[in-house]
């Protein structure tokens, strides 16, 4: 994407991945009500401009709706899967204060994020074999230096079970 428009750095992958708010799984919808004019809503405008793209990138399952100039005071409303609503007043707050507050009340804590990251890394460990959906490799024959799969290249006679059974039977006689 070309670096054109207002503050194009907001669309870079590095900037988007720097966001640190990952919502809990119960958050389904986030609405932002703010005004485009006035001093009291300056933090909300900066929050929408700088931080909403990061939140969208980190939380693709959350629907985010923006309402401009429909309210006297800026606020955020979160709809949870249990039917509850969480209302956050953002009047006179800066965009950083808003991010910290939202992270504190509806964000996952560091321990949960660390545990989820560990589980993802464990699933993608190169020693695991299985369907491509879950593992990096389907068969041991895909590892360099291993014996190729008998489905692709036939095994030498000495390694087959029939040959070894015949050898044992001949030794017993």
Swiss-Prot record:
Stored InterPro entries: Ribosomal_mL43/mS25/NADH_DH, Ribosomal_mS25/mL61, Thioredoxin-like_sf
Cellular compartment(s): Mitochondrion
Major location category of this protein: mitochondrion
GO molecular function: structural constituent of ribosome
Keywords of this entry: Mitochondrion, Ribonucleoprotein, Ribosomal protein
A Pfam family assignment: L51_S25_CI-B8
Cellular compartments per GO CC: mitochondrial inner membrane; mitochondrial small ribosomal subunit; mitochondrion
Single GO BP term: mitochondrial translation
Family from the record: Belongs to the mitochondrion-specific ribosomal protein mS25 family.
Subunit field text: Component of the mitochondrial ribosome small subunit (28S) which comprises a 12S rRNA and about 30 distinct proteins.
Name of this chain's protein: Small ribosomal subunit protein mS25
Gene source species: Bos taurus
């Amino acid at each position: 994407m070309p670096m054109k428009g207002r503050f194009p750095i907001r669309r870079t992958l590095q900037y988007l991945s720097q966001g640190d708010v990952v919502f809990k799984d119960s958050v389904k919808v986030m609405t932002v009500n703010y005004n485009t004019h006035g001093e009291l809503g300056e933090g909300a405008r900066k929050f929408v401009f700088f931080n909403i793209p990061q939140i969208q990138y980190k939380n693709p399952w959350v629907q985010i709706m923006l309402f401009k100039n429909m309210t006297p005071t800026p606020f955020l409303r979160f709809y949870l899967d249990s039917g509850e609503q969480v209302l956050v007043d953002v009047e006179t707050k800066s965009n950083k204060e808003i991010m910290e507050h939202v992270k504190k009340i509806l964000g996952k804590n560091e321990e949960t994020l660390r545990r989820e990251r560990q589980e993802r890394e464990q699933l993608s460990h190169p020693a695991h074999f299985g369907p491509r959906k879950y593992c990096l490799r389907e068969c041991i024959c895909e590892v360099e230096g291993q014996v190729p799969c008998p489905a692709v290249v036939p095994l030498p006679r000495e390694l087959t079970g029939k040959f070894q059974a015949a050898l044992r039977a001949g030794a017993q006689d």
